[in-house]
Curated annotation (Swiss-Prot):
Subunit-structure text: The complex is composed of two ATP-binding proteins (TauB), two transmembrane proteins (TauC) and a solute-binding protein (TauA).
Record protein name field: Taurine import ATP-binding protein TauB
Pfam family, one: ABC_tran
Uppermost EC category: translocase
InterPro entries: AAA+_ATPase, ABC_transporter-like_ATP-bd, ABC_transporter-like_CS, ABC_transporter_ATP-bind, P-loop_NTPase
Membrane topology field: Peripheral membrane protein
Lineage per the UniProt record: Bacteria, Pseudomonadati, Pseudomonadota, Betaproteobacteria, Burkholderiales
Main location per the UniProt record: membrane
Keyword Ubl conjugation: no
Cell location: Cell inner membrane
Encoding gene, per UniProt annotation: tauB
Domain annotation ABC transporter: ranges: 4-236
Binding-site list for ATP: 41-48
Length: 258
């Protein structure tokens, strides 16, 4: 079973011999299969820096990250990333975009296309597999990005504000899609957002981070994602008095620590 361990992680920004900024300070976090962890906090609290370290895009200044006991020293196929901007290749078809990671790993075209169509079906886009991505709406492009991240069957899904640029209705539909995929595949998910409501709805565990330097100020274990999987009614979940109480408490906490 996969386990992601973040042990006393600190990150300094700056140049050798010059002034440095402590972006993250002594972050400790453990995630196991089926955990959906959401990081929430004011701008500058280190959320994206933390995700970049987990992805292997950055090296920590102190501490380490381990995936199933192995220290993370760079990007790897066991960690899929979905960015705020979809980062798709506009000259490729939808299916070829989804299959890109498999192509780079030397997988045969027949197998790449089989997996691409399977993952596109999972996000409701199998009918547009042959289209160029520039013909798709923003929400559809982001679903292609999710399918691409799933194509290599990663143990960990890293999602850096993937819904921030979408309209409210599209955002809600993709939130529901993400939870259904998580419930089915039981991957570790680490998700960044600025939306308190989105964080409460998606997270099984919510970490609220403080800035200057970035630290985990508070951790919440939450029931709402699993409630949605059971009932399928997002509006009912978000209208629950317990959901509203958590929302107000967390907004107050973020204001107090910003």
């Amino acid at each position: 079973m996969y386990k992601l361990e973040i042990d006393n992680l600190s990150v300094n920004y700056g140049v050798a011999g010059g002034a440095k900024t402590l972006a993250l300070s002594q972050v400790n976090l453990t995630m196991e299969r089926g955990d959906f962890v959401v990081a929430l906090g004011a701008s500058g609290c280190g959320k994206t820096t933390l995700l970049s370290c987990i992805a292997g895009f950055m090296e920590p200044s102190e501490g380490e990250i381990r995936l199933s006991g192995k220290v993370v020293r760079g990007p790897g196929a066991e960690r899929g990333v979905v960015f705020q901007k979809h980062a798709l290749m506009p000259w490729l078809s939808v299916a070829d975009n989804v299959a890109l990671g498999l192509r780079l790993r030397g997988v045969s075209r027949a197998e790449r296309m089989r997996v691409a169509h399977e993952k596109l079906a999972a996000v409701g886009l199998e009918d547009v597999a042959g289209k160029p991505v520039y013909q798709l709406s923003g929400g559809m492009q982001q679903r292609v990005g999710i399918a691409r991240a799933l194509a290599c069957d990663p143990a960990v899904m890293l999602m850096d504000e993937p819904l921030g640029a979408l309209d409210a209705l599209t955002r809600e539909s993709i939130q529901a899609l993400i939870l259904k995929l998580w419930a089915k595949e039981q991957k570790i998910v680490f998700f960044i957002t600025h939306s308190v409501e989105e964080a409460l709805f998606l997270a099984t565990r919510l970490i609220v981070m403080t800035p200057s330097p970035g630290r985990i100020a508070h951790t919440y274990e939450l029931p709402f994602a699993r409630r949605f999987i059971e009932c399928g009614d997002a509006r009912a979940v978000k209208a629950d008095p317990e959901f509203i109480r958590y929302r107000e408490e967390i907004i107050d906490l973020i204001h107090a620590t910003a």
